């Protein structure tokens, strides 16, 4: 299980972005995305936290033809960080 933090900027509205992420997780994330939270920073930026079962499988979700086309159409840019617990 991996924890991720993603900074995302986009040209579409935040509402459309959030609806698309919800749909994407439901359709492609079963068994991969265990939990996620989106945080609206402004109308064109979001921070999100994901718990995923496999980093490799999550990266494949980001790299599908559908995801690439959506990113291009909405000028969506992601910066993905892997989080680790400090003990």
What is each residue range found by the language model?
Residues 1-68, 78-87:
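Short S/T/G/P-rich N-terminal loop/turn motif that feeds into the first structured element of a domain
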């Amino acid at each position: 299980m991996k924890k991720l933090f993603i900074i995302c900027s986009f040209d579409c509205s935040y509402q459309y972005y959030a609806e698309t992420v919800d749909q994407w997780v439901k359709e492609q994330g079963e068994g991969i995305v265990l939990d996620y939270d989106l945080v609206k920073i402004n109308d064109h930026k979001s921070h999100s936290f994901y718990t995923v079962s496999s980093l490799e499988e999550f990266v494949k979700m980001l790299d599908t033809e559908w995801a690439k086309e959506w990113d291009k159409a909405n000028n969506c840019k992601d910066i993905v960080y892997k989080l680790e617990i400090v003990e």
